[in-house]
């Protein structure tokens, strides 16, 4: 009997039931025989709850034959896997909350994928993700790592540069934008094609096609007239119409952190005072979710998961697995090596771009050069990415300092030096490479 094993690193995540739902709905195309859920000892209770819920969900759909295994080490989970999904959080949500509070202490944004928050999370995550990659090299060399771990672009590039494991990075921002823009146009999803190019959480829609008609300017006009592209976890501040028309492209929700910085910072400061930082809010949501997940009568993904902020996560993951496993040659937006697709970026730079997905992995579609306003910002952030990776891999304080200085949301030496000292102190248990 042919086997199809999927290992989920961070299997105790609150997002996992959405992934399980996606696998169940696509079981005809993706005949999974084993789901190996991996977590750390601190997540033992959560992963046990997730495993039990997974078994109930499978039983509801007549898939009791799918084996669900739980692991607190990597070897047995990865051995024999065709796909290794990474959705881990080193330091758990408490570390994210500390990152956010640290940023606000310096009157800076500390969001978990941008600024000092993204920096600290990358330092904690890269050594661990490289351990996973080395296990994949040794125990499942033909497997694909599908990475959801934030900051997804940096983490994916670290694995791509420092291991031989096959990796593709994923994010739910492009698919959310696809759904929202199709909705704005009152069109079916399959009728609308978006051309993306940029970096993870710094990607633009450069062209919108509805059938054979280009409707980019129409969508921009709709955004200028009150429509909005927003996500649960990002304040939906409106873009000035003059700016959008000058840009001639559609920014992703995360661009607000870079181009509407004062307003976004003010909102986060106020939120931290009243309802808590985003991580502190998520902790409350997660506690409620796991209370629901633990109910023995629950055998489907609960509606409350939509409040967590990971909408369409499973859709992206399952579509990617399907495209690789069945050699579909399907176009998707992923994080992969540039290989000349975006001019001016190194071939080994990981970019977020439309790609053809088949059994060989991801092949980015040629794009060309980004317009100057986008290229300048993106090159600066890519420099930050590279320096952060070097700092995380080698425990290099010099690279870490330069990374923070190069980040547009820090951008000055005085704050960077002070922030670095605090990041290294607060995160000492996870940053042994700097000791």
For each of these PLM feature ranges, what is it?
Residues 144, 148-212:
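Rossmann-fold dinucleotide-binding core
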Residues 67-80:
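Short acidic low-complexity segments
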Residues 79, 85-86, 147:
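Redox-cofactor binding/interface segments in oxidoreductases and associated redox assembly factors
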Residues 5-31, 35-38:
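N-terminal Rossmann-like dinucleotide-binding module
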Residues 189-435:
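Long, compositionally biased stretches enriched for glycine and/or charged residues
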Residues 94-161:
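Rossmann-fold NAD(P)-binding glycine/threonine-rich loop
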Residues 88-91:
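Conserved NAD(P)H cofactor-binding loop of Rossmann-fold oxidoreductase domains
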Residues 25-63:
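Glycine-rich phosphate-binding loop and adjoining beta1-alpha1-beta2 segment
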């Amino acid at each position: 009997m042919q086997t199809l094993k999927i290992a989920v690193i961070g299997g105790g995540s609150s997002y996992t039931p959405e992934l399980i739902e996606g696998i169940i709905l696509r079981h005809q195309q993706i005949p999974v025989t084993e789901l190996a859920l991996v977590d750390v000892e601190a997540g033992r209770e959560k992963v046990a709850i997730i495993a039990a819920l997974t078994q109930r969900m499978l039983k509801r759909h007549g898939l009791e034959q799918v084996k669900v295994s739980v692991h607190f080490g990597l070897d047995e989970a990865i051995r024999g896997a065709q796909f290794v999904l990474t959705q881990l959080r080193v330091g758990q949500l408490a570390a994210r909350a500390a990152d956010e509070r640290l940023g606000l202490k310096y009157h800076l944004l500390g969001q978990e994928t941008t600024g000092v928050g993204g920096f600290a999370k990358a330092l904690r995550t890269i050594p661990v993700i490289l351990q996973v990659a080395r296990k994949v090299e040794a125990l499942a060399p033909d497997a694909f790592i599908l990475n959801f771990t934030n900051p997804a672009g940096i983490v994916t590039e670290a694995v791509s540069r420092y291991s031989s494991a096959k990796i593709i990075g994923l994010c739910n921002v492009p698919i959310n934008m696809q759904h929202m823009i199709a909705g704005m146009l009152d069109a079916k999803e399959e009728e609308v094609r978006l051309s993306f190019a940029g970096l993870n959480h710094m990607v633009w829609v450069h062209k919108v096609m509805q059938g054979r008609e280009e409707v980019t300017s129409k969508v921009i006009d709709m955004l200028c007239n009150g429509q909005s592209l927003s996500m649960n976890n990002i304040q939906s501040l409106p873009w000035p119409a003059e700016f959008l028309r000058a840009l001639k492209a559609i920014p992703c929700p995360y661009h607000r952190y870079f181009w509407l910085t004062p307003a976004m910072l003010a909102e986060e400061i106020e939120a931290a005072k009243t309802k808590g930082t985003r991580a502190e809010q998520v902790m409350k949501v997660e506690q409620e979710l796991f209370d629901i997940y633990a109910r023995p009568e629950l055998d489907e993904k609960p509606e409350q998961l939509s409040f967590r902020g990971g909408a369409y996560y499973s859709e992206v993951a399952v579509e990617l697995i399907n495209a690789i496993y069945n050699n579909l040659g399907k176009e998707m937006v992923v994080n992969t090596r540039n290989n000349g697709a975006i001019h001016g970026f190194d071939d080994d730079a990981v970019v977020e771009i439309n790609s053809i997905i088949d059994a060989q992995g991801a092949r980015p579609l040629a794009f060309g050069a980004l317009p100057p306003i986008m290229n300048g910002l993106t090159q600066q952030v890519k420099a930050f990415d590279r320096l952060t990776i070097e700092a995380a891999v080698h425990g290099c304080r010099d690279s870490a300092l330069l990374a923070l200085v190069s980040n547009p949301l820090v951008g000055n030496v005085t704050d960077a030096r002070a922030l670095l000292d605090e990041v290294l102190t607060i995160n000492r248990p996870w940053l042994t490479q700097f000791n």
